[in-house]
Each structure stands twice: as structure tokens, then as C-alpha cells.
């Protein structure tokens, strides 16, 4: 949101500040949903865990829109929405999924905790990277969306050695100059990206309802959409800057 955009209620600055603070509270509510997901993970109720992570993901998907609409950084500069977002995201995108990957019979038993440590540490470093995003909203390196990696590992249940290789690959991609697309904010193919993300969300909910035993076609579509978003940053036009 540009500085020339007027506040929502220019004649009521106090109300604007209250609205921004309420948006920050809404963002912070993601910590509670992540806690509920953590409890479910400890109890090994995996569909329930992913369900709460989905609620946290929904909050994360719309709070930024509200904050930009209200010009949160200018209206209430005391509180950093960016820092708050990172705190909330680390819980839901990294900590809870790392626990699930480590305790969900996904990896070779002797390497579960080392893999979880690699996930947690690499993601913490990534979240501290001031250059994690390009000007056009691509992510530099794997953006630590371990909630999605965990979802696919639980859905596909590959051989533990293959699962370990996948985890190692994404940890390595965290630090490599590879671009990953933001499905909502990157302008290129945005209608397609939003459509695919919506289809993915609906099928993911069906998968959770079916306790990770969806019809084969659902698994196939989810996998194809996942591959698309994984490669979308790599397949962007090379003749211009990311768009």
C-alpha cells in the first residue's frame, strides 16, 4: 500500500489505530491455533493437527491484506506487523510440522531428531534473512513452508530414506539462490495461481476428512499442483526480472 493511499477513516485516527491493533490481535491468534495443532501432534491426531494448521494458514492469508488496507505500519508504528507475522509463522510453518515429521513415523528412527533440528535451525536463519523476498514477491530460497512438506509426507508416505532425502533437499534449498513463487502476491499468472491454490485447499480439506486416505485422483491432483508451485519460480521467463 502506497503512502498516497488515505486511511480508511481519515477523520477518526483513533479508530484507525484501534482497527490496526485488532488486525494485530487477529494475526496473533495464529499462535493459539498453532498451540492447538501442537497438542494434536503430541497426541498423534494428524488430521486434527493439519486442520488447526489450516486455520492458522487462513489467518495468515488474510491478515496481511487487512494490514495493508489499513496502512498498519504508518497508522500504528509502535507494533511491527512483520515481526509479529514471523513469530506466528515460525510456530505454524516450522515448529509444529517439525514435531510431526519427527514423531509421525516418517523418517528413519535414528535420524528423526537430527532432521527436526535441521528444519528448525535452517528455518530460523531463513526468517532472519532481510532479503528473503524479491521486489516482485518471489521468495529467495525455500520459504520454510514445512507445514506443506509435512502434509505431502503424510499423504504420500514415501520410504523413510526417501522422506529423509526430501527433508535434506528442502533444508539445502533454504540457502540456495532459487526462487519460489508466492501464490497470492506474484502478479505473473496470479489468476491461475489463485485458482490452483483454491482447488488445492478444497482437496486438502477432503484429504483430512478422509484421514489421509483420499481417492487416488485427489492424491494425483494435489501432487500435480504441488509440483507446479514448486517449479513455478524456476520456470518464470528468463528475459526479464521476476514479475
Task: Tell me the role of every PLM-derived stretch.
Residues 53-60, 118-126, 170-177, 222-229:
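Alpha-helical transmembrane segments of multi-pass membrane proteins
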Residues 10-72:
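Active-site-proximal cofactor/substrate-binding loop regions of enzyme domains
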Residues 15-25, 79-87, 132-141, 183-191:
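Short, amphipathic, aromatic/basic-enriched membrane-interface segments that mark the entry/exit
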Residues 1-9, 139-243:
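C-terminal membrane-associated helical module and adjoining short loops/tails
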Residues 65-74, 122-137, 175-184, 231-239:
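C-terminal ends of transmembrane helices
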Residues 2-14, 62-81, 137-140, 243:
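Cytosolic, membrane-interface loops and tails of multi-pass inner-membrane proteins
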Residues 23-28, 69-126:
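Multi-pass membrane catalytic core of lipid/isoprenoid biosynthesis enzymes
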Residues 36-52, 87, 91, 95-116, ...:
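Helix-coil boundary and interhelical linker segments in multi-pass alpha-helical membrane proteins
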Amino acid at each position: 500500500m502506497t503512502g498516497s493511499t488515505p486511511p480508511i477513516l481519515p477523520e477518526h485516527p483513533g479508530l484507525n489505530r484501534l482497527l490496526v491493533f485488532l488486525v494485530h490481535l487477529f494475526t496473533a491468534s495464529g499462535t493459539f491455533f498453532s498451540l492447538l495443532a501442537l497438542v494434536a501432534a503430541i497426541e498423534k491426531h494428524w488430521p486434527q493437527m493439519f486442520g488447526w494448521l489450516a486455520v492458522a494458514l487462513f489467518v495468515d492469508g488474510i491478515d496481511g491484506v487487512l494490514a495493508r488496507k489499513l496502512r498498519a505500519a504508518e497508522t500504528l508504528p509502535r507494533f511491527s506487523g512483520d515481526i509479529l507475522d514471523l513469530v506466528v509463522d515460525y510456530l505454524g510453518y516450522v515448529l509444529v510440522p517439525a514435531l510431526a515429521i519427527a514423531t509421525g513415523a516418517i523418517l528413519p528412527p535414528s535420524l528423526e531428531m537430527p532432521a527436526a533440528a535441521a528444519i528448525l535451525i535452517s528455518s530460523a536463519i531463513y526468517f532472519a534473512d532481510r532479503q528473503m523476498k524479491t521486489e516482485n514477491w518471489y521468495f529467495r530460497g525455500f520459504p520454510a513452508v514445512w507445514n506443506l512438506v509435512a502434509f505431502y509426507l503424510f499423504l504420500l508416505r514415501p520410504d523413510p530414506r526417501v522422506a529423509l532425502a526430501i527433508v535434506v533437499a528442502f533444508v539445502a534449498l533454504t540457502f540456495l539462490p532459487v526462487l519460489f513463487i508466492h501464490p497470492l502476491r506474484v502478479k505473473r499468472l496470479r489468476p491461475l495461481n489463485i485458482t490452483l491454490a483454491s482447488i488445492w485447499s478444497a482437496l486438502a480439506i477432503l484429504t483430512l476428512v478422509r484421514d489421509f486416505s483420499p481417492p487416488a485422483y485427489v492424491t494425483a491432483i494435489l501432487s500435480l499442483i504441488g509440483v507446479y508451485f514448486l517449479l513455478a519460480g524456476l520456470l518464470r521467463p528468463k528475459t526479464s526480472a521476476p514479475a
